[in-house]
Amino acid sequence: MYKIKYQIEAVFLIREIDVAEGKSSKGESFLKGTFVLTIAGFVVKVIGSLNWIFVSRILGGEGIGLYQMAFPIYFFAMTVSQAGVPVAISIITAERVALRDIYGAKRVFRISMMLMLFTGIFFSILTYLAADWLIDWQLIRDARAYKAVVVLAPTVFFVTLLASSRGYLQGWQRMTPTAVSQIVEQIFRVVTMIVLASVLMPWGLDYEAAGASLGAFAGAVTGLIVLIYFHIRLERDIARDYGTDLKPLSGADYESRCSIIRRIFKLALPVSAASIMLPVVSNLDLMIVPQRLEAAGYSISEATELFGYLNGMAVPLVNLATILTASMAMSIVPAISESRVLGDSTRVYNQTAASVRISNFVCFPAFVIVFMLATPISSLIYNAPGAGPAVMISAVSIILLGLHQVSTGILQGLGHPTIPMVNMLLAAAAKVFLNWHLTAIPWLGIMGAAWATAADMGVAALINLYFIYRFIGYRIEFLQLLKTICAAGIMAASVYAFYTWTMAWWQIAAISTFGAVFFGCGIYVTAMILLR
């Protein structure tokens, strides 16, 4: 072991991050992994956004409706079958690699692939059969969505194999394969959707929607092919660095097949449950928020419009602003898992501190931008200045969601995936309570729902941080947090001044908004350096 110092003075105020010495077959640091996953996440979102412009024009409102009827069924089957698998496999693989049990790491992959093979087949068949049941029981109201559901069934199988492959490579702390496969998967998905939806247009809307659904299948298959290539590269590196005659460990460190399967389920199930909870909470929002807006005195059409401002405009901006922390949550899991199994508590602490610092460093200026420029951003992106209040309050969620994502990854790396899941459940209960009461207050309205969402993230993040403190003694450094808040405050003042002055001078919203963003970011980085 030795220490590599990441001199990141302008950003993280000189934090020394411990990194274990590894051979060339080992992966990237979690900072590099975070970077490549962030770039991939941004590219995927941009491609996806452009895709909807073209697909919406081809399918029209009715065709999109058929597609949207089918996709939640696929999403649910995909979530149940594999949502927590990459996390589970990455944790177990990272532990084996840390113990230099390369035979054991490869064995984990073989067992997980066999498990996912059967799981994928089961849920693919279930999805296929569900198409008939859902239409017969009138849960899908339009029978024309049948074809779109059926063609998604085999996709579930390939997605489960993708999950296992990504988890194994992430366990080696190789995040580039995941990033590249995500981009390739999205490209092929989008191209297939557009081409098939166009080609099948003469056959009718049901065939068009089915063609669009086949995009997910094409993306999953090509993504898997990309991962196979990276697996071959990894095997070559392992053979070079560790030889081909790998032996299993003996004694206490050996893990039986049944033990590995049990651990995969034990680690994956809480993550899957948390993933399922997200659409459940969204559906609760759908039932509660418009109803309580009506109770506040809004008409049905006004309530629908305000709900669209929050869920359709504000929430996507929050998710976009937290791409980096979502990526970090993925890359920190195997890094902390490796440090934990080696018993290196100092390294676990430093990795935790670095990830929280990075989260705050990125999320605070993102909060300032969205909060201070909520109405201009809403006007430029959505042509909906009325979304400004919902976007402004939702900006608070950026900081809290970033902390929640990172703290969840830390707890998963520490081997406690159930804790974030339970915390999400408690936070969701708080959100439902606040949604019901705050949204019905006339002077709050949709801003009450936005505050409820922020509280949801805040409660989950704070409880996560409490458990992190209990396990490793880490608490957020107050002085560093204060410096970040001061720098963000200076940035907020500069953004306001720049936007106000340029709007008064040029009266061009786009120049004023984007100029304020870049000017504010420059001021923020400068302030962080001066406050170092």
What does each model-found stretch correspond to?
Residues F122-R141, P365-N383:
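Short membrane-interface helical motifs at transmembrane helix boundaries
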Residues T176, I187-F230, T418, A428-L462, ...:
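Membrane-interface helix-loop junctions in multi-pass transport and translocation proteins
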Residues V159-S181, V396-L426:
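Membrane-interface junctions at transmembrane-helix termini in multi-pass inner-membrane proteins
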Residues Y2, F12-V19, L196-L200, A218-A252, ...:
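C-terminal transmembrane helix end/exit motif
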Residues A83-A98, N319-D344, T352, V356:
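Helix-loop junctions and terminal segments of transmembrane helices
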Residues S29-S90, E95, S124, Y128, ...:
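Signature of the first transmembrane helix
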Residues M1-I47, Y103, R107, S250-S275, ...:
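N-terminal membrane topogenesis motif
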Residues I140-S164, V368, N383-S407:
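Alpha-helical transmembrane segments of multi-pass membrane proteins
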